């Protein structure tokens, strides 16, 4: 007979089993043992199956679900790291908002700011940026070279003009005595600032040029103040090269021509300075002092007129 699948107990096995019982030797059929082990293994696997549901099919790696307490949650940046990523405008706005909500910290912030030493070049770079913003705000349909910009251009350009003039006045006041002891540096900075204002595009209507003219008047007062400081320090006048003072006077004369005579007063003060010998310098002291006194009287009269008149509320020079 050929090979048969499965195991069927034959008569020989039964007979041998019966005969062996008499001798006391018990014989266990091999096929029956294998079946029992197979069934037992299957039952054990079925019992362990619910406990091993999380076993991965590939590689046999356990895929246990992590407990909620072991999850890594995202969190915002620390204050220092966040401020490192903020740009200049965001930092400025943050500081302004804090001072608005908490006015008590304004004095502390102001004390820290005025204690910083800002270079003149940094101030000039900022002024040039704001001056460029004025030119960029000019409408495309009009050219500023003709100095005949209309009312529409004035409305468009007014915010940038006021921002530039306010910044210019603040920087000038921070770079003259007693804030800055170097008189030559103050004069040079004032010279550049005056040039920036003179070159600004003007408007066809005279009333739209009010802010420009008011600014030039204030610059005239600053020029007179610096000339007064130079007149008091005779050592500077005698030790320095006269060409330096003549250069300032020449440039001031050009600015006066472009401003329709608004800088005439400091120009006359410059001309009253004698850069020659000590005797000549002492002879011009009286005339210079008289000019300075007249200058202060003029400033006082102008301030009284401004206080009595109705000046614009958004002007940076009132």
UniProtKB/Swiss-Prot annotation:
Transmembrane segments: none annotated. GO terms for molecular function: proteasome binding. Keywords: Cytoplasm, Nucleus, Protein transport, Transport. InterPro entries: Cut8/Sts1_fam, Cut8/Sts1_sf. Residues 1-75 are annotated as: Disordered. Signal peptide: none annotated. GO terms for cellular component: cytoplasm; nuclear membrane. It comes from the Eukaryota. Its main location: cytoplasm. Gene3D superfamilies: Tethering factor for nuclear proteasome Cut8/Sts1 (1.20.58.1590). GO terms for biological process: nuclear protein quality control by the ubiquitin-proteasome system; proteasome localization; protein transport. It is found in: Cytoplasm; Nucleus. Residues 11-24 have a biased composition (Polar residues). Belongs to the cut8/STS1 family. PANTHER family: FI02826P. Involved in ubiquitin-mediated protein degradation. Regulatory factor in the ubiquitin/proteasome pathway that controls the turnover of proteasome substrates. Targets proteasomes to the nucleus and facilitates the degradation of nuclear proteins. Binds the proteasome. Interacts with karyopherin SRP1 and Proteasome subunit RPN11. This is Tethering factor for nuclear proteasome STS1.
